[in-house]
Amino acid sequence: MSFWTSTIICVLLFQTVEPQPVRIDKDWNINQAYVDVFKILSTQNTCSDFYGGPRRATTVLNSFVIRVKTQSLLREVSFQMEGSVTIFHDPTTGAVYRLFEKTAVNIHGSFYQRRADPMRKFPSDVGNFAPGSRAARALILLHELGHLIQGEDGTWLLPDDGNDDRRSSANTIRVQSVCRAQLEKLK
């Protein structure tokens, strides 16, 4: 076999390898949300397309989810990423993405807490989904993933929320709109 032939075979094999779920040592809620999101992103659909396709999306998800820690934050906050940022370029997928030094999910927020009394404001819904539901947890992870992946135009798929509740809500609605069909199946 010539060098040229072996190179082509290696490239083709390398490109067809699908990312596999990583084993994470997290609590049940994070594990379930991760598995749900991995399943959503591992097939070709409008949701995975938003994140650059199944290979790119699941590669970044795997790098991201292992960093997630639980923390007590203000109840209005579901998730927080802060600290120094590291930029990654994955040559096999072409993904350019960033990971933050600190990545925390709020134990008192909408990821974990359900609203016992429908008349209460907190924990708040996540998009159109009830707090603490499978769909809400998956939407939270998908929202955060959108802040990490750089689009073809060089900007992040979702602009940083900062402390802007309106921008955060708009980002959540944007993700929900492209992932609605997949999220609805989690109810």
Question: Which residues does each predicted region cover?
Answer:
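Sec-dependent signal peptide recognition
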Residues: 1-9
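Walker B catalytic acidic pair
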Residues: 144
